[in-house]
Regions:
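Conserved thiamine diphosphate
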Residues: 1-113, 229
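Thiamine diphosphate
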Residues: 29-30, 82-232
C-alpha cells in the first residue's frame, strides 16, 4: 500500500518494465494480521493502465510465469503468490502462456463454470469432485491471468454453461469476480455468483481458520454453484 504511488508514477506512468512480486497473498498472510493482510492488492494493480496481474496456483505455474516476465518490456506486472503450504496442482515444466486461462475440467454436460485462481484452484477442484458426486457437471477454469483477461474463454464458458461462479482469495470487490463480471456485462450477460472475501478487513489467525471464516472453502463454492444454477 505504501509503495503504490511510486509504482503508479515512477514505473507505470513512466512506461518502465517493472515486475512486482507480492508474497503471502490474501488470507495466506495468516498471523501477520489484519494490517498486513492483502485482500485488495490485485485491485490496486488492476486499476493502473497497461498492467498485467497474475495469481498462480502453485510453484510450477509461478516458475513458468517468471520465465515469461522478461519478455514483457513495458508496463508493470504484478504477481501475487504464496510462500508456504502450497498444494501441487500442475506437473513441473508445464506451460502457461500469460493471458490464457487453463481449462481443468470440461464436458458437454456442464451446467455451470467455476472460474478461479491461486490457492482457490485446489478448493475449486474439491468442489468439482463434490458436485460430480451429486451428478452435477461443472467446468473448471484456472484464470491465473486476471489482466489481460482471457475474455474469449470466459464468453465461451458463459454461453455453453449459462452460469458462472468466481472463486478468489481476494476481496470480491474489484477482484477476479469483478473482472469476469465486466467481461460478461459487455459481451454475454450471465448469472454469476461470487466466492471470496465479502468486503471485510483482514484478521489474525491460522490460514485454515481464515479460509473458514471468509467462506473460501469447497463447500462455499458448491453452494454458490447450486445458487447460480437455480437462478438460470
Amino acid at each position: 500500500r505504501r509503495c503504490y504511488d511510486q509504482i503508479y508514477m515512477s514505473a507505470a506512468y513512466a512506461g518502465l518494465p517493472v515486475h512486482v512480486l507480492g508474497s503471502d497473498a490474501g488470507v495466506t498472510a495468516a498471523f501477520n494480521g489484519g494490517t498486513h493482510m492483502p485482500l485488495e492488492d490485485a485491485a490496486m494493480y488492476l486499476s493502473i493502465p497497461e498492467t498485467v496481474v497474475l495469481d498462480p496456483a502453485d510453484y510450477a505455474q509461478l516458475e513458468c510465469i517468471t520465465r515469461q516476465l522478461p519478455g514483457i518490456t513495458s508496463g508493470v506486472t504484478y504477481t501475487r503468490f504464496v510462500r508456504k503450504g502450497i498444494v501441487k496442482v500442475y506437473e513441473d515444466g508445464s506451460e502457461f502462456p500469460i493471458g490464457k486461462g487453463v481449462v481443468l475440467h470440461e464436458s458437454d454436460k456442464d451446467v455451470a463454470t467455476i472460474i478461479t485462481s491461486g490457492i482457490m484452484v485446489d478448493e475449486s477442484l474439491k468442489a468439482y469432485e463434490a458436485l460430480q458426486a451429486e451428478g452435477i457437471s461443472v467446468r473448471v477454469i484456472d484464470m491465473f491471468t486476471w489482466k489481460p483477461l482471457d475474455e474469449e474463454l470466459v464468453i465461451k464458458a458463459a454461453k455453453e454453461t449459462g452460469a458462472i461462479v468466481t472463486a478468489e482469495n481476494h476481496n470480491v470487490t474489484c477482484g477476479l469476480g469483478s473482472v469476469v463480471s465486466n467481461c460478461l456485462a459487455k459481451n454475454c450477460p450471465t448469472v454469476q455468483e461470487f466466492v471470496g472475501v465479502q468486503d471485510l478487513f483482514g484478521q489474525v489467525g491460522p490460514q485454515d481458520f481464515l479460509m473458514d471464516e471468509y467462506g473460501l472453502r469447497a463447500a462455499n463454492i458448491v453452494a454458490a454453484v447450486k445458487k447460480a444454477i437455480s437462478r438460470k
